[in-house]
A protein has these predicted regions:
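Single conserved hydrophobic/aromatic residue that forms the stacking wall/gate
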Residues: 1-10
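Mid-sequence, gly/pro-rich, charge-dense loop/helix-turn segments that line enzyme active sites
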Residues: 44-132
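His/Asp/Glu-rich mid-to-C-terminal helical/loop segments that flank catalytic regions of hydrolases
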Residues: 165-195
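N-terminal beta-alpha supersecondary unit
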Residues: 9-21
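Alpha-helix C-terminal capping segments
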Residues: 25-29, 47-48, 146-154
Length: 195
């Protein structure tokens, strides 16, 4: 552990613009050396169940569509990158810490797809899977990843799965949210201690 470690914790409203702005503020004002973002997401993979954790290998914008200008779906115009790679060192540390802190929870590593919409329709979910693959779908990770990437800051997006992204959620959202927050706090505190 570094003796100079001083973490900043932020809270922002939902959506990609808010997430990107928050990340840019962390870069510009606080000069952060890494960004670890935790939250909840819907599952895009049949093996990833409610309560499981997904650690990002990369993040992308599933709702970006500039095909008419010759870009791939998901690719931001005038950028070569199709997705933004998460930091491997942070991901390995998170995987290790997850097993130590929450051994009963399954941990997956994979792509996280972001868009400014809550996915609860199976046909929309299936379209995202067909186009991009991925393990989880949510509303902030790609903006965080993009801002971190453009600022040359290592990042990791960590998501607890809250639903199957198909309208079949059975657990009370407030109940799940509290459990997810508890797991995320344990994970983040432990990761910071080991950085």
């Amino acid at each position: 552990p570094r003796s100079t470690l001083f973490p900043y914790t932020t809270l922002f409203r939902s959506g990609k613009v808010n997430a990107g702005m928050c990340t840019q503020i962390l870069a510009d004002i606080f000069g952060v050396e890494a960004v670890i973002n935790t939250g909840i997401a819907g599952s895009l993979n049949n093996d990833v169940n409610i309560g499981d954790i997904v650690l990002s290998t990369d993040v992308l914008h599933h709702d970006m569509d500039a095909i008419g200008f010759g870009y791939k779906k998901g690719q931001i115009p005038q950028m070569d990158e199709f997705s933004f790679p998460a930091d491997e060192k942070l991901r390995k540390l998170a995987a290790k810490v997850c097993k130590e802190v929450n051994p009963e929870i399954s941990v997956f590593e994979g792509r996280i797809c972001s868009g400014d919409q809550f996915i609860s329709d199976k046909s929309v979910k299936d379209a995202i899977i067909s186009e991009f693959g991925g393990f989880a779908v949510e509303m902030e990770g790609a903006a965080i990843g993009q801002a971190a990437y453009l600022n040359h800051i290592p990042f990791l997006v960590v998501r607890a799965i809250s639903d199957k992204a198909d309208g079949s959620a059975h657990m009370d959202y407030a109940e799940f949210e509290m459990a997810a927050i508890e797991h995320s706090v344990k994970l983040t505190v432990r990761m910071i201690q080991e950085l």
